[in-house]
From Swiss-Prot:
Catalytic activity: an N-acyl-L-alpha-aminoacyl-tRNA + H2O = an N-acyl-L-amino acid + a tRNA + H(+)
Entry GO terms, CC: cytoplasm
Protein's name in the database: Peptidyl-tRNA hydrolase
Site (Discriminates between blocked and unblocked aminoacyl-tRNA): 13
GO biological process entries: protein quality control for misfolded or incompletely synthesized proteins; rescue of stalled ribosome
Enzyme Commission number(s): 3.1.1.29
Amino acid sequence: MNNNEKFIIGLGNPGKEYIQNRHNIGFLLLENFSEKYDSKFTLKNKLKSWYSEFKINNFTYRLFMPNTFMNNSGNAVRAIVDWYKIDLDRLFIIVDDIDLPLGKIRFRKKGSSGGHNGIKDIINKLQTENFNRIKIGIGSPPVNERKKTLNTISHVLGNISSKESLTLDRVYKKLIESLIELNDKNEDYIISELNSFHREENL
């Protein structure tokens, strides 16, 4: 990271009916982030996203919530990357992950989609797997082999419970602090710290 800008894109689905869905955890993190620093989101049609920016310690933070649906997230990410001519090491994608326990964080600098349709579309549109993604665990749906697909959909599109919110609030706090601290000198340390973080162990 050689520039004093960080580009953070949270994935989710637009629309009031999706606001509190587990699948919208990327949006929820960025809303917490912008609120903490008194910044508002405005719609930028050319970027296919809602956009917020603010400065902390000489760094400019540019936050984006795509107004495409999750499965078309790559359209917004491609528009953002092209407009700002972003080096991908300064880009951070925030997503939910059903394969991680609730509250677990996993930071990866590259890799496959892991079955996440939003990440899959970004890989397709950018034509590379080499970009940062920060996964937040939402836990797995109840096991029911006969209705596995249905259970997964209902789980990710289900609303976050009040108990889950208590867990995720601590995760948001940790991630926001880490994204602010992150720089080219401490990157490996921050990534390791995030990957070892689990809400239950840090109460």
